[in-house]
Amino acid sequence: MKKNWTKILTITLEIIIIIIASFLVIRNVCYTAIIVNQSSMNPTLNDGDYGYAIKTKHALNNIKRFDIVIFELEENNEKKDLIKRIIGLPNEEIEFKDDSDLYVNNVLIEQDFIDKETQKLTNIGLKQKKFIVPENQYFVLGDNRGISYDSRNFGYIEQNSIFGILKIITKHYSNYNNETNKYEKEEFISFKFF
């Protein structure tokens, strides 16, 4: 009888180890964890939000308009990771009219995901209002248009610089006490799927 329990326990532990190992392999091969540390994607993403981005070759070869992507930007011999929304696909014409209306191939694009207050493009030094996206490149914008550093500033991003498409985000809220310099309460309120 004792041998049976030992055998059952051994098999159960082996199954648990296989499940955990499979989960870790899938997570590391297919997904990358992210922490948002910028406000250029407000109100969709906030500083401190956690998420997972898919990084499979199939997903990265099927990028669609409005996908939120994580990519590497190299400027002045420095590399940094940014999170932005895909607006223009290869070979499309992007145009800003009246400082806030966004047109793709002469069609007005509805942007329900941005705050109307941040939609205005004034005071950001926009030198160019019309863009033609080259082959294998994308035009990206932050949802917080008034402060976002994006394709309006650094130009198009190469397809091969994109290493993830955001799929899950956990909205993170915390109360910071300025007197104690500590977070008093942290809550993970909701999940958002893209």
Regions found by a protein language model. Give the residues of each.
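Soluble "head" domains of membrane/secretory-pathway proteins
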Residues: 2-9, 14, 43, 47-194
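Alpha-helical transmembrane signal-anchor/signal-peptide segments
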Residues: 30-47
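Short N-terminal signal/transit or membrane-insertion segments
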Residues: 25-29, 34, 76
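Alpha-helical transmembrane segments and their juxtamembrane interfaces
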Residues: 24, 37-38, 153
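Hydrophobic membrane-insertion alpha-helices, especially the h-region
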Residues: 10-29
